[in-house]
Amino acid sequence: GPAYYQQQADYKMDVVLDDKNKRIDGVETITYHNNSPESLEYLWVQLDQNMRARQSKTPLIESQKMEGSVPVDGFVKNYMQQTFDGGFNLVYVNDANGKPLSYVINQTMMRIDLPTPLKPKEKVSFSIKWWYNINNYRVDGGRSGYEEFEKDGNRLYVIAQFFPRMAVYNDVEGWQNMQFWGRGEFALAFGNYDVNITVPADHVLEATGVLLNRKEVFTAEQVKRYELAEKTFDKPVLIVTPDEAKATEKGFSDKTKIWKFRAENVRDFAFSSSRKFIYDAMAVKLETKNVMAISLYPNESNPLWEQYSTKAVAQTLKTYSKHTFDYPYHKAISVSAEDQGMEYPMICWNYGRPDANGYVSDRIKYGMISVIIHEVGHNYFPMIVNSDERQWSWMDEGLDTFLQYLAEQDFMENYPSSRGPAHKIVPYMSGDQKFLEPIMSN
């Protein structure tokens, strides 16, 4: 209605990915716009990495169930011994003049007390410097982290929730400051991002937003290939080839490059980086614009990914745009990351690779295609239609799952979709009531 408002949070960030020490260092300036009719005496900031801090309650909450009796040594091992040294380490929280701000940290949330109330239609800027150790998500779990390739000593990074982020303030509940323990997802405010990411010079990287310095981070030949991809609508064009990726993964450069991105009107920012990446792309024609469909994957993902990933991204954009609204951003990226299925604005992590013998079963093939369609589809819900995932997971999951079915059927005739038609809910609803889970919410 006429009284509707939404807050805005803008970020300027410089981030360093330290591959040798598996660590992120960052400094950010947040400019928070108060578009509400209320004066705000304090701000809530999300510290999602603290779900991995030693005092985190995540191990207790992540456990599916606890038996009636547990041996003492088993309880200590599962619920009290956390070997990974995770969580944000805050170096400073300063105002625009460089003076320290008063703040209190409560697990995964931080309240910053403002020197003077932030009045309606005003904005405030403050800076945070931080670092944290990156988790091996295949060992420690989580929606971001790194995947270790022991045979060649490389890592594939999928980095999200890596910076302190503004919590949502709205006209329904005020501050949405529910804790993040890993299971719930995210409630976020839209804003603009200017992000500089320093990584090893031999890494290939993609992220939310427009890459501002393509000619500085890709070779001249790779830039030409990308320009060709922008005009190619029928099949992906290899920007970084399998042979180039194989050669690069042996290098381990001690030099660095800075990748510069700008993203406008997005609710979050994420990136992926590795020297193992093959990179392909193709153009997708929508009703009002062309969009780039992009995939990043290691050689271990082939031949499956080069054959299907980018085409699945393209089909998702076509089907979802047909049934909802044209995709507003300029690209959508699918990244191969084993044991992942997670979405962020313009970029997502997806599982599915040939088995250890190089065999691709129908289960692996269709599972990979489906998760790509689903996670790319989350760009529409909740990345654009910005629902509160922390409180109401079903809102975006329900819409996305329905549209996923439509995209699967468009992608391939007789696609074996696991969900979609209404009759497929019958076995679930007619099953043992003791095992029916409640609607997805917190």
Language-model regions: role of each:
Residues 376-392, 410:
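Catalytic Zn2+-binding segment of zinc metalloproteases
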Residues 28-30, 34, 47-49, 122-136, ...:
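Short, hydrophobic/aromatic-enriched beta-strand segments in well-ordered soluble domains
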Residues 44-98, 198-203:
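Solvent-exposed beta-hairpin/edge-strand motifs
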Residues 1-25:
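N-terminal, polar/Ser/Thr-rich
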Residues 23, 33, 39, 70-150, ...:
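A surface-exposed beta-strand-loop module
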Residues 164-175, 181-373, 402:
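Hydrophobic helix-coil surface modules that form long, contiguous segments used
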Residues 55-70, 131-193, 214:
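Glycine/proline-rich low-complexity spacer/linker segments in large multi-domain proteins
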Residues 397, 401-442:
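Acidic/His/Gly-enriched intrinsically disordered linker/tail segments
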